[in-house]
Amino acid sequence: MANATIKYTTMDLYGILKSCKCSSDERLTHQSLSGGRFSVTGSKVGEFWRAVADRIESGEPIDISEARQKETPLTLDFDVVDKDCKEPVPDVLVNNIHAAVARWARSSLKPAPEDRDLCGVVLTKPVRQCAKGWKKGFHIQYPKLVLETGVAKNLVVGPALRPICSKVWEAVTGTAKDYLDPLSCTVPWLVYGASKPDEPFAWKIARTLDHAGKTIDFNTAFGDVETPPSWGRPTSDRHREAMVLSIHPAGRSVFFRRYDFTAANPGRVTRLADYSAVMAKLDVARQRKPAWNTDATKAHRLKRVTDLTAMLTADLADDRQTWLNVGFCLWQQTSGSAEGYKVWLSFSKKSDKCDEDECWTIWNNQMRPNSFTEGTLVYLAQKHNPGAYLNWLQVKSTPVNDIGTNVAMAKIMWDYYGHQFVCCGGKTQTWYRFDGLTWVESNQGTDLRSLISAEGGPLRRLLMRQLDAVTAAKARGGRDSGNEDDEEDSATDEDDSNPWDSELRRLDSEVLDTMVKRLRNNLKGIEMTGVKNNVLRECAELFYQPEFGDVIDSDPLLFAFANGIYDFREGCLRDGRPEDKLSRRAPVDFVMFGPIPKARHPDNSPVMRPKRMPGESVQDHARRLAECFEQDDVSASAGTMGKEDVESFSCNPNDFKGPVTKLLAFFASVFPDEGTRRFFLRNAAATFVGGNPDKVVLFWTGTGNNGKTVTQTLFEKMLGCFAVKMSTQTLTGRKPSAGSANPEMARLGGGVRWAVMEEPNSDETINAGTLKSMTGNDSFFARDLYCAGKTTFEIKPMFKLHVICNALPGIKDADQATWNRVRVVPFESTFVTPGTTAPADAKYVFPADTDITRKLDRLTAPLAWYLVYCWACIQNERVKYVPPPKVMEATMAYQKEHDLFRQFVEEMLRKDPDSTLTCDDAYTAFRDWTSANSPHGTVRRPKGQVVKCLEAILGKKTVDGWPGYAVGAEQQE
């Protein structure tokens, strides 16, 4: 019966093709390598794929190839022939070629592909001999990267990918080879499972690689791939693999994102090729480096995460956030494999709330690449089940030959503290220790050094255990005699608590004596300075993470309070994690004085685009896309929540209760005008979120006792080390020369959120270039004192800039881009102490609270909650905010007072319908006027710059100049 089914399948496949034959002038979709042209369309497509799948399952040969259409997935054919070596192409070479192609695609395709679109499938055949040598070619296919066939042929494979792949080949093998076929995306492509008539082997899937070149399950990589209904539903894994690996775009390409090639210059391709070669060399070096631990192997990593997860207690499984964090961590560490899911499910079953269907849905649909590391599991195990973790650590085997050495002791320290300490930096090593919330700098590793000799510490306990094991082996007489009784004793005595027993039995008594002596010396030595220093030096190599100093405090959406981390992505306060990489924390607790609305954040609201339906024309699909864009615009203005769910932003004390009411009463006295108060608090609401997206600097101005200093002190008390006071020279002085130390600018790194310049002198003017660079969100370099040039670090500004002054300072060489960043906040209140009177022009007068400084400490926690609350409300606003007139009027008055060109026009030009102001006359008059009147106008301005600035005020000039204007004061009537 089975044979009859196979026979029917064979006849069915070629019967389908026979009914789809086409002539030479018709468009073909498939062709037979033994002869025949076919056009398989309509309902025949589903029948064709079912027949192909049946032939693959039965092992019958197929000689059908697919013809290229207008669009094609990226396919790379490497024709490798080696005269001498019959070994297959190394996996490290293929993986690095794939990683290089992924880098190229990410930088050269528009729009940039996502990581999930860069999965590649490696197809191979067995190595076979031919007349020229050993054939061991391979294919790499990218089903989700769909390009125009002409673009792939003329701009991608030959000009870009061929030199990159050649460089990688040379880096791994030492010989540059151009094995990539330039016609890889042009010639017909064999259907999966098909082979040429003269070859017995078909191309088979060897492995699937993710964007980084790591092996991933095929269904995990392409589980989101959908095929047209006319193709039918796959009935087996082989059936689905053949459909996914089809290059046929008819009725299918619309289900994939298309990428238009952005031509890169040859220099860019060369740099990318060189970089890929360096990465390949490092990968080869890592694989060749001998290591006595097997942490890098997948099996060992799976065992480690399985053991660590088993130590987690049931209360952690009950906490949903921790339960999800463990799931994301396991998904990342196991690449979303089925084994990882089993580990997570086993942990989930510790809770009575476990729902296997929910676990399966989350694992397959919601899990995604993340920053969780094995350190998350280690930290949870150490914190919630320290005894089990130490017992597990004791069972971990140290090679017998390394017992008692400094390297072995350092490895023990790394096994236990590897996720709590980090060493980074160059010649001057910098150590960090994770204290459960943030990473705290440890002076020269002093904290780790003290743990080396700690009583009851892991190192001392494991050394004692190793000494007991070696002493026991020595007591048995050293090397085994080979007697059956000895073997029986060995089997009886050896257990998991002594992983070295079998190896120690094979050693001579002299070697055991040496090991005993070495272990006893180490137990004494760990209390001596020299041994501790040597172990710490070995630890520096194991704990070293060179990039740690560059990424610490770099996440703008994480902020550390004294009692936890507020995650603005998730909108919640949570425990600290090692992978947060935060080193600063505010001195105040985050107190939940009330509920905080869910913020509509870009990370939480992905936009879904409708797919093109089978049979739908391109024009109809384009119209539906236009409707989708209109709906997105409406939803963006209306928010993602219903009208009744959106909480409006309020700064009225009557809308709140308790300490928040006192806080807003304070701001109501400082800013009696509600518009100004709302503007100030809106800007302050983004304090905890890094960056300056609005690119503004606030100038706090007002004379007398008006609350500027008290307000600044309140924010300083709340932010602590996140707030920095700058010297006025930072903005008013000259830019430091290249390479010189600039400690003031260096202080602005490390996640600082609040930068203030107070009270510049009357003769100081702000440098417009420095002001724009500090508010433009562009990174800058700054060298601290006593730092070498190589250690100069790049600072990504996370702060908002504030200038506090009684009189607004001048801005040197300010253009319109400078004034667009300036906002003046008038402090109009006057606080009068007993026995004094307010000035005659005071607009708002309040009695001064002489005890306000002490009371500020009780306002810091309400301020922290209120700013987060305001930020969430602002994210959900539907109407674009417009600054109040009072702020804009003060800003325009400031601009008018310090805008040289407007002053020049008002003082030196007059309207005259019979005159025309020439460029030469205007430039001469402006030069003379600035020399006589401007305190900072001594810098000679080019004529073209003066003309351009005057055009912004007087309008576009004609060939002769500006008609209707003349030099001279306006005549009085």
UniProtKB/Swiss-Prot annotation:
> Where on this chain does ATP bind?
702-709
Domain SF3 helicase intervals: 658-840
- Say yes or no: keyword Nucleotide-binding present: yes
One Pfam family hit: PriCT_2
EC number(s) per UniProt? 3.6.4.-
The GO molecular function terms of this record are: ATP binding; hydrolase activity, acting on acid anhydrides
Q: Which InterPro entries match?
A: AEP_C962R, Helicase_put_C_phage/plasmid, Helicase_SF3_DNA-vir, P-loop_NTPase, Phage/plasmid_primase_P4_C, PriCT_2, Viral_Helicase-Primase_Cplx
| Gene3D superfamilies registered for this protein in UniProt | P-loop containing nucleotide triphosphate hydrolases (3.40.50.300)
User: Which ranges are annotated Acidic residues under compositional bias?
Assistant: 483-498
Q: Which UniProt keywords apply?
A: ATP-binding, Hydrolase, Nucleotide-binding
Does the keyword field hold Oxidoreductase?
Answer: no
Which residue ranges does the record annotate as region Disordered?
473-502
NCBIfam families documented for this protein: primase_Cterm
What PANTHER family does the entry give? ATP BINDING PROTEIN-RELATED, SF3 HELICASE DOMAIN-CONTAINING PROTEIN
The protein's name: Putative helicase 022R
